[in-house]
Amino acid sequence: MPAQLEHVNYTVRDARKTAAWLCDVFGWQVRWEGPSIHNGFSMHVGSDGDYVAIYQPEAVNANPSTNYATVNGLNHIGITVDDLDATEDRVKSAGFTTHSHADYEPGRRFYFHDADQIEYEVVQYD
């Protein structure tokens, strides 16, 4: 069996707020939450097979980078869905603006940034 990605861990300002919209938009659930490294707080949000680990530090860096040229940065998180249009409606209802829509072989996609300026790519494959 080839290796499989289990989770991605990234930093947010408010883990509970991020977890709430992730569950609403993607139909995920909170798998675990609790104290974390450096007096922070973490939540695991996703499905039975995979998840994102969102980490809220005790003190937040006021100058996060959003540049693709930053080494050790996160460019975007890609998520596949069964119904792109319905997911886009939920993304917009959560208060986020979608952009960079594209139809391509073998599917369709759009992007959005959350309140922490983390970029997400949402894809529906045909």
Q: What annotation goes with each model-predicted range?
A:
Residues 2, 9-52, 93:
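Core segments of cupin and vicinal oxygen chelate
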Residues 53-55, 121:
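Conserved beta-strand in the GNAT
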Residues 21, 85-90:
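Short amphipathic alpha-helices within nucleic acid-binding modules
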Residues 9-11, 78-82:
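Short hydrophobic/aromatic beta-strand micro-patches
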Residues 39, 73, 106:
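Exposed loop/turn and edge beta-strand positions of beta-sandwich/beta-sheet ligand-binding modules
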Residues 38-39, 60-65:
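A short, acidic/glycine-rich surface segment
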